[in-house]
Amino acid sequence: MGGLFTRTNDLLNSMPGLAGPMHRTPSQLFARRLRRRHAGLGPVAAQRQATDRLFFAVRPDPETAAKIAEHTMRWRAAHGLTGKPLKPEHLHVTLCHVGDDDAPPPTELIDALAERAAAVTMPAFRVEFDRVMSFGGGAFVLGGDDHLIGLHVLQQRLSDALDARPGPARRFEPHVTLLRDSRRIVEQPIEPISWTAREIVLVHSLLGQTIHRDVVRVPLLQA
């Protein structure tokens, strides 16, 4: 796992289009330290346990998050689920998974990711989820279709901003994970839950500790 943040940082800094005083590059000392850390480790590196995750997301506003959490308790009881619901402040739609590593993300990487995300131009938009269902990995989620086009557009633009070689749209199924449970639930319609997406958030998650830190917030254009 070790080194994913490093390679991501190297990739971002090799990409064209951000030259100038706003572009921050890793220090030579930082680069040498990373080379020493990952050079010649072989199987040892593979055995390291990932502790830190970075991902870009869209979050519901606090009022909507509280509403989702309240509904989750009812859906959990109605479907006989036993998994622990996510905290309201942890509810989100993942846009792009940056990576997992065995150390906290360096400031240089956070800065580079923030700069790339800031290059995404898109107005605030409304999202609406109208069903619940089981998803991969035992997740019980909010899902939708027709009213999630804005998330598809934002995810593609953000992916292009982060990718040295923008290409066709990646597979992306917008959803909000509510809890995890081994019992699978077929798709069920619900009264729609909606909010206005106003910003992109870069989240630093401490794996296994249920700790999320919003390290960067990039506002979308306001109408």
Question: Residue ranges of each PLM-predicted region?
Answer:
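Histidine-dependent nucleotide/RNA phosphoesterase domain, centered on the 2H-phosphoesterase fold
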Residues: G2-A223
